[in-house]
Amino acid sequence: MSMTDLLSAEDIKKAIGAFTAADSFDHKKFFQMVGLKKKSADDVKKVFHILDKDKSGFIEEDELGSILKGFSSDARDLSAKETKTLMAAGDKDGDGKIGVEEFSTLVAES
């Protein structure tokens, strides 16, 4: 399954384009722009599993840094600052990684 099976390619392209400048990434705006906020809980979980590149059941910091590439291969990596901000927002239990429920909460709070 690819991201475009779940989300509009046009919405993804617009959202990626909105955050091309370094340190401009805003996960709340991004999740809204790609249409993730409007998706069912099942679809949000499917997106999580696409972003969980190593299939560990968690999105770790290195995967988080390349989260935009999970939506579009030609997107940029997040800066260290953006990655840490996103991890702080999503890692509710403080274990240094984001689980599927934490990701679902992160999207719901967008």
Swiss-Prot record:
Sites of Phosphoserine modification: S2, S8, S24, S66
Cross-referenced InterPro entries, in alphabetical order? Answer: EF-hand-dom_pair (IPR011992), EF_Hand_1_Ca_BS (IPR018247), EF_hand_dom (IPR002048), Parvalbumin (IPR008080)
Record's Gene3D superfamilies? EF-hand
Per UniProt, residues of the EF-hand domain are 39-74, 78-110
Q: Which CDD domains match?
A: EFh_parvalbumin_alpha
GO terms under biological process: cochlea development; excitatory chemical synaptic transmission; gene expression; inhibitory chemical synaptic transmission
Chain positions with N-acetylserine modification: S2
GO CC field: axon; cuticular plate; cytoplasm; neuronal cell body; protein-containing complex; stereocilium; terminal bouton
What Pfam families does this protein's entry cite?
Answer: EF-hand_7 (PF13499)
Q: What is the effect of changing R76A?
A: No effect in the overall structure of the protein
What PANTHER family is this protein classified in? PARVALBUMIN ALPHA (PTHR11653:SF2)
Specify the protein name: Parvalbumin alpha
Q: Which organism is it from?
A: Rattus norvegicus
Lineage of this protein's species? Eukaryota, Metazoa, Chordata, Craniata, Vertebrata
Q: What gene name is given for the protein in this entry?
A: Pvalb
